[in-house]
């Protein structure tokens, strides 16, 4: 903002995520340099304004002694964006289960959130990456673990709980995009005080007195870690000679 620049996109990836993507793709973001956190900045507008903003931005980067790459073609831009797009696919190769949290914190608290993730990764010996929308403080924290490993699963749950408490301490919210649904119900009371909670329950009861609209969501505690993994198949994923899969019931 001090530069008078309003990027259309501002995406962040921490060092661990960058290392993960580079290992997955076999490509270096900054050739010849060790992995660093990455901030993807995209400008839009008319050609004149983009050129002016680009000059100001590059000067700020140089004055700050930061390494940067400038995309001078669509092909180069796609190469840089691949780092962001490959974040989730790269992490899926590390373990069979992912807890993907879309927490959001005030802009000036993002560094504290990232530092918290680094501490959790070390303390709990887990594969945890953080990336996301730096422009609005909505960062995705991905906990990778193997579901059948009870010790690792327990560590993932404890680390996630610590993350949610930290988000609350920083004045943030447990969901910036995906909503509460089922998986976040164990943490939702961290975000709302008793008065807010009772108000929401009263509104729910007024609009849905018989509890038929999206039953079990938000207000009923649901423990996702006690649930068995559910595998679904689609009709076009098996031949007509194969027996139809048994319906999934709950």
Can you say where each PLM-predicted feature lies in the sequence?
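Noncatalytic alpha-helical scaffold of FAD-dependent oxidoreductases
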Residues: 1-250
């Amino acid at each position: 903002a001090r530069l008078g620049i309003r990027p259309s996109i501002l995406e962040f990836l921490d060092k661990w995520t960058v290392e993960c993507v580079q290992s997955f793709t076999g490509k270096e973001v900054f050739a010849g340099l060790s992995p660093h956190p990455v901030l993807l900045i995209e400008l839009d507008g008319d050609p004149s304004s983009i050129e002016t903003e680009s000059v100001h931005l590059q000067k700020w980067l140089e004055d700050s002694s930061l390494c940067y790459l400038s995309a001078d073609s669509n092909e180069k831009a796609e190469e840089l964006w691949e780092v962001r797009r490959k974040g989730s696919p790269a992490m899926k190769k590390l373990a069979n289960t992912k807890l993907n949290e879309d927490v959001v914190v005030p802009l000036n608290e993002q560094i504290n959130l990232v530092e918290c993730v680094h501490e959790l990764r070390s303390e709990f010996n887990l594969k945890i990456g953080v990336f996301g929308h730096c422009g609005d403080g909505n960062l995705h924290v991905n906990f990778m673990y193997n579901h059948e490993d009870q010790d690792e699963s327990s560590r993932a749950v404890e680390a996630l709980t610590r993350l949610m408490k930290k988000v609350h301490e920083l004045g943030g919210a447990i969901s910036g995009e995906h909503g509460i649904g089922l998986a976040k119900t164990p943490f939702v009371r961290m975000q709302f005080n008793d008065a807010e909670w009772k108000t929401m329950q009263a509104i729910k009861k007024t609009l849905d007195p018989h509890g038929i609209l999206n039953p079990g969501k938000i207000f009923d505690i649901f423990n996702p870690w006690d649930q068995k993994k559910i595998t679904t198949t689609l009709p076009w994923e098996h031949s007509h000679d194969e027996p139809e899969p048994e319906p999934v019931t709950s």
